A protein has these predicted regions:
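An aromatic/glycine/proline-enriched structural segment found at the starts
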Residues: 167, 171-177, 192-266, 429-433
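Acidic/histidine-enriched alpha-helical segments
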Residues: 62, 118-142, 229-239, 335, ...
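Short, Gly/Pro- and small/polar-rich lid/capping loops
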Residues: 1-9
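Short, polar/flexible loop-turn hinges at active-site or ligand-entry regions and domain interfaces
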Residues: 51-54, 96-99, 118-127
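A conserved active-site cap/scaffold subdomain adjacent to cofactor or substrate pockets
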Residues: 252-256, 264-267, 272-284
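M16 family metallopeptidases and their MPP-like homologs
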Residues: 13-15, 21-41, 58-114, 150-173, ...
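Active-site SXXK
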Residues: 42-49
Length: 433
């Protein structure tokens, strides 16, 4: 993957991806998340995906994509630590496979740039009807999260964990703000994104001439905008604190327990391989300690797994437990972490986890979407404002092969519990309270 700076705050990353019969053009907008515009930016991709100036409704857009041999347009948003990311992506077959020699890549470029820079406006703002429809969809999604107690517990724990820090901005939006959003507010948020976002153009499966044409078309669009890209927020970590225990009571069959840990300092890119193996050993695989011991041996959890967020240097352990077993489950989870830090790690479990990770990483390059996700996250993880080298999947696999038990223990020893959040129908709180 080649990455070059083509304008202030704008990079081009490209790969010919010759083994695929499809190509992909993606435009990523990344900018610091802000509390006051979080809900508008959560709504933005839903409205943008409905169409653009040349295809102002979903019917015409669907017909256009169908004529291009079933091309696909997606506009989505995803949180990246303290930064927000909106991506416009078009995927379709390469020119070489067009039955009548159509210039498909040029059409994909028009669609991607149209969706990104020429949305369908009515009187200078997003279409009020489209905004109204998508507000209901966003509202329903946020309401559904409350009913999914696993997600709700994680969000409540995150709110307690991050507090007022930039990573605490709820980038999925705030339910109480959805009804108040207007087309004018959404348009203002969109225009702010165009002015201030760092832009990553990823072109996969195109030759050099096609890539250059896509680059030039993007630069022509940007020339019409008074750009002032903001520096992205670098990776962070919450400071270590005395553990905070919170309990909410709900009438539910299964209690939910979410425990959040912090590294205490930002994760460095060179630590990533050890972090991956540490998570697989602790709770990220079917051979992990949490799965084999807390779930299978002790029968304390219906599920119990760990995950790590590199942008915020935090680990989450999520579990579903019997109400009466919540305190025991928490202590068992902490014990497994302590045992990995100070006790033996067998060669068998260590290599099982390593092989499992390597097997999963072997599939990264099996799809254009996988390649794009890998490299874009690597860009952000390394620091989008820096010239740090970007790690390829093969380099990451080699780094994983070199990780030692001591390196894994060093990562795990840095993790300290900050928040333990319990949803239960019983009034009994954690044993630690």
């Amino acid at each position: 993957m080649e990455r070059t700076l083509i304008a202030p705050g704008v990079h081009l990353s490209c790969d010919p991806a010759s083994k695929f019969n499809r190509c992909r053009i993606s435009i990523h907008f990344a900018f610091p998340a802000q509390r006051k515009t979080a809900t508008a930016h959560a709504l933005l991709p839903l409205v943008m995906e409905r169409g653009y100036a040349d295809c102002p409704d979903m019917t015409r857009l669907t017909k256009k994509l169908a004529k291009l041999y079933g091309a696909d347009l997606t506009v989505d948003a995803r949180p990246m630590g303290c930064n927000h990311n909106l991506c416009v992506s078009v995927t379709g077959i390469k020119n070489a496979f067009a039955l009548e020699g159509e210039a498909l890549t040029a059409e994909y470029t028009k669609i991607a740039l149209g969706a990104a820079f020429h949305p369908y406006f009515v009187d200078g703002c997003f279409d009020p009807q489209a905004v109204s429809i998508e507000k209901q969809m966003l509202k329903k999604g946020l309401e559904d999260e409350i009913n999914d107690k696993r997600i709700y517990c994680l969000h409540q724990a995150n709110r307690e964990f991050f507090g007022d820090s930039p990573a605490g901005v709820r980038q999925e939006g705030y339910l109480e703000e959805v009804d108040g959003l207007t087309p004018a507010m959404l348009t203002a948020a969109y225009q702010q994104m165009l002015r201030t976002a760092n832009i990553e153009l990823l072109v996969l499966g195109c030759d050099a001439a096609q890539t250059a044409a896509i680059r030039d078309a993007l630069l022509a669009e940007l020339a019409c905008i008074d750009r002032a890209p903001l520096l992205l927020v670098e990776n962070m970590a919450m400071p270590a604190i005395a553990p905070v225990h919170k309990t909410e009571n709900y009438d539910m069959v299964q209690a939910k327990l979410c425990m959040l840990f912090t590294l205490g300092q930002p994760m460095q890119p060179q630590q990533l391989a050890a972090v991956r193996l540490a998570m697989a050993l602790y709770g990220g695989s079917v051979t992990s300690r949490l799965f084999l011991n807390v779930r299978e041996r002790d029968h304390l959890c219906y599920y119990c797994s760990s995950s790590f967020q590199s942008f915020t240097g935090s680990m989450a352990v999520n579990s579903g437990v019997e109400h009466a077993d919540a305190a025991r489950a928490e202590q068992a989870i902490l014990k497994e972490l302590a045992d990995l830090c100070t006790g033996p790690i067998t060669d068998e479990e260590f290599e099982d986890c390593r092989r499992g990770l390597l097997s999963g990483m072997n599939g990264v390059e099996d799809s254009l979407g996988g390649i794009e996700s890998w490299y874009y996250i690597e860009v952000l993880r390394a620091g989008a404002n820096s010239a740090a080298p970007i790690q390829s999947p093969e380099q990451a696999r080699n780094a994983l092969r070199a990780v030692t038990k001591d390196e894994v223990r060093d990562i795990l020893r840095r993790l300290t519990l900050s928040v333990s959040y319990l949803l239960t129908k019983e009034d009994a709180a954690h044993a630690a309270e």
